[in-house]
Design a protein with these regions (language model features):
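A glycine-rich, hydrophobic/aromatic-adjacent loop/helix-cap motif
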Residues: 2-238
């Protein structure tokens, strides 16, 4: 797995023009209280079945709003979008939870897996990724095809807090409790899915393990996920 740590960031800046690097470091990380109110209702529409792609208005409306993306699960260890740097960040009012059914990436229609969502309450530590200027359209297209395929998430600008105390606006994908794919699994069923299910992108156990290891790499301790991983590994070894 590749991570954008401080060494990577220094290397990236060293290979960037002095003018561009200076601009990246001096730009304000501004947050507006209006950000949390901004959601786009068109995003809840289902992906057109004939193309398998999200409709353009779903992501183009964000082009002038999004400079940062908040990752709390696989977007930490596999963002798949052009980014300049990643910063440790925290979102209040939401927590990371296995609450979204996965019938493609980590499961199948016959054996659905489960992936993470931002659910109401608590707080969530993750990564804020700064998008490469001029490539926002590519980043958003990629994110919509990946995260918004079945409408189980709602795209929302979140107030993201940095360790420095600064705040910024970041696009996040929040679980939609009203969606059929939103789950409230019993612990035994959650463990079963994590231990047994597999989809186009690999096993559910790998998804969990990669997330735990990525969080630890960045100095984030999620004890709930760490305990889940221990129990899943124990279940698989029996």
């Amino acid at each position: 797995m590749e991570f954008l740590n401080q060494g990577d960031q220094a290397s990236l800046l060293a290979n960037t023009s002095n003018e561009h690097a200076s601009l990246m470091l001096k730009q304000p990380l501004a947050w507006s209280p209006l950000a949390e109110k901004q959601t786009v209702k068109t995003i809840v529409h289902q992906t057109p079945k004939q193309t398998g792609r999200p409709s353009e208005p779903d992501w183009t409306v964000w082009l002038d709003k999004v400079r940062w993306v908040f990752g709390y699960g696989s977007l930490i260890w596999n963002p798949e979008i052009p980014v300049v740097r990643g910063l440790l960040a925290r979102v209040d009012g939401y927590h990371r939870r296995f609450c979204i059914s996965s019938t493609r990436y980590r499961g199948t229609p016959e054996q659905p897996g489960v992936v993470l969502g931002l659910d109401r309450g608590g707080r969530c530590h993750g990564m804020a990724w700064e998008l490469v200027a001029g490539q926002e359209d590519l980043a958003l297209k990629t994110l919509w095809a990946r995260e918004m395929r079945n409408g189980a998430y709602r795209a929302k600008l979140l107030k993201v807090k940095l360790p420095s105390g600064e705040c910024l606006n970041a696009l996040g994908f929040v679980a939609r409790r009203e969606h059929p794919n939103f789950l409230r699994l019993r612990e035994d069923e959650l463990l079963r899915r994590l231990a047994q299910c597999r989809g186009d992108r690999g096993s559910n156990q790998d998804y969990l393990a990669n997330t735990v290891h990525a969080l630890q790499h960045h100095g984030i301790s999620d004890q709930k996920l760490q305990q889940l991983l221990k129990e899943v590994q124990a279940q698989r070894s029996n």
